[in-house]
Amino acid sequence: DDIMYKPPFDITNKMLNLSISITEKIGLINSFSSLKRMPVLRKNNKIKSIHSSLAIEANSLSLSQVKDVIDGKVVLGPKKEIQEVKNAYLAYSSLNTFDGYLEEDLLRAHSIMTYLTCDESGKYRNHGEGVFDGDKVIFVAPPENMVPALMNDLFEWLKKDNDTPILIKSCVFHYEFVFIHPFGDGNGRIARLWQNV
């Protein structure tokens, strides 16, 4: 079976060595059964991940406010930002329900991550998209009519490429996903979430 599309990248020896080193460290961490019995540590790490991911996208809530929202406490802050925290917590809590190779699961993750905060929740964008700094164009995403085919090709590559180490594959997917910018909102949050899937 030929792969329809292959993202443009070359695997260097340095990439391979880093991938092996990271994989070994993950295996070592996973071997500590005591960590599996520490739900508070896992929850705190999840809260820190959520806070960092949202802060990158200008969510102004502090780490303690994010923790309070997740703990069901009343927090004074922008309604949309509070909803973003609730959505992100649900999405990160659902990680084990997502199959990283299924496009439908990516759309489902987006619908969770952008619930009540985005008009096109769980749907690819139907408009042009770009990144701007004032009037200066930083990046223009592919046209909206190309998004479904580009995302299909990306997932087909992900499923069919059995030669690229999984860690490198996930990084290439992240890069390509951010380049395609398939959603009207939440691309960075979903890219970071999917890196965990």
Spans of model-derived segments:
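FIC/Doc superfamily catalytic core
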Residues: D1-V197
